[in-house]
Design a protein with these regions (language model features):
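Small/polar-rich, solvent-exposed N-terminal microdomains that initiate assembly or binding
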Residues: 1-65, 165-167
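Oligomerization/assembly interface segments of phage tail-like spikes and tubes
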Residues: 64-81, 144-158
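Short, charged, solvent-exposed linker or helix-capping segments at domain edges/interfaces
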Residues: 82-86, 161-167
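A solvent-exposed, charged loop/short amphipathic helix patch at secondary-structure junctions
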Residues: 80-103
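Intrinsically disordered, low-complexity segments enriched in small/polar residues
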Residues: 22-24, 30, 88, 93, ...
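Short, well-structured alpha-helical interface segments that form or flank functional binding sites
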Residues: 5, 67, 109, 113
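Acidic-leaning, charged glycine-interspersed low-complexity segments
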Residues: 17, 21-23, 43-47, 98-157
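Hydrophobic beta-strand residues in large extracellular and virion-surface proteins
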Residues: 10, 54, 72, 114, ...
Length: 167
């Protein structure tokens, strides 16, 4: 049940964030299939970048706590050199790099917005760990994307009680 609540919180944030157009969950290798929704347009395209995509990675239990680790991908498309209309900043390669850097910068800001919103939310039963690791990625998909993967650890109360087992 806890993963469902975290997934819903991420969807709510994605839907309310003005710079996010699509959201999905599941296996990152299957981004763009039925696990991704377009939040902004009636287009039949499943992904309209920028995209936020969440993948539950692991869970561990300790005395009184369940830790759920979720990888949250913040990604956007990087324009191809051909669509940039020629040479930018003196060199096509530099133009490409400028665009990639802008995408990385924008996606890092969106990731920070999500982290801020998820940290110490008094309305939720879980808390986000104060340390979130962010790892950049570039050109990781066929559709030329760049962005960040935030590894978030959610701490959820767990009593280890047999009374919670359905009968």
């Amino acid at each position: 049940m806890s993963w469902i609540k975290i997934k819903q919180a991420l969807l709510t944030l994605a839907n309310s964030h003005p710079q996010v157009n699509s959201f999905g969950t599941g296996d990152p290798l299957a981004i763009g299939t039925d696990n991704t929704i377009n939040l902004r347009t009636p287009s039949r395209e499943r992904i309209v970048y920028p995209l936020v995509f969440a993948d539950v990675q692991s869970a561990t239990t300790d005395a009184g706590t369940l830790s759920l680790v979720v990888g949250v991908y913040f990604s956007d498309g990087v324009e191809s050199i051909a669509s940039m209309g020629g040479v930018v900043s003196g060199s096509p390669t530099l133009g490409w790099q400028d665009n990639e850097d802008e995408v990385l910068s924008d996606q890092l800001q969106i990731a920070q917005d999500f982290i801020s919103s998820l940290t110490n939310d008094p309305s939720e039963e879980w808390t986000l760990s104060t340390s979130v690791s962010l790892t950049r990625f570039v050109e990781s998909r066929d559709d030329r994307t760049a962005g960040w993967v935030a590894t978030m650890s959610f701490q959820i109360p767990y009593s280890h009680s047999v009374c919670e087992i359905p009968t």
